[in-house]
């Protein structure tokens, strides 16, 4: 059983430099089971660079990473996957010409004893996971290029969850989606929370953060401005943190 008093993830005093410039400067953030933490800041604030230490895309030059209380080393995306960390990029990394099941198992196909693709098993497993995440999803027999933005997000999320993700990194999951599709993704995120996953949400839209997240961590110029529970702050407070680099709750 998951211990909710121990963070799923703790990034402690993480620092990364590029060409002598501190992209991330001693930043600490954490994430608990069943929680969504939004990461905000202008382009170049350091939020994506910070989270790429967790996904294995970058290596921190200083700091520590703890997963469920245990110190770990993440040198590459394979190390991240070994820690049940999955990333859903804005591009979704889906193969447009393949259907949902083929995308879900892309690179991790189920093979029969005879050495052939077990397409019926893969479709059955896809239907099972989609029934859990998005019961309204019915388009199993068409290429994902024919799906709406929200349906494509469903496939990308299902792929991560099927392969036992405990920690999900989502890069602007509602970008370029209409209101109805955005609501679909919001419902998916709520379902993932119920199942105990922890989600880091990289976002530019403050309204989405206030709606989808439990806490918001704001960065500016590579430093952490602050982390606040969204129910304790206003959108203007968050905007002030992004623009001014100061937390209105810090007096003096």
Annotate the PLM regions.
Residues 2-252:
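Glycine-rich phosphate-binding loops of nucleotide-dependent enzymes
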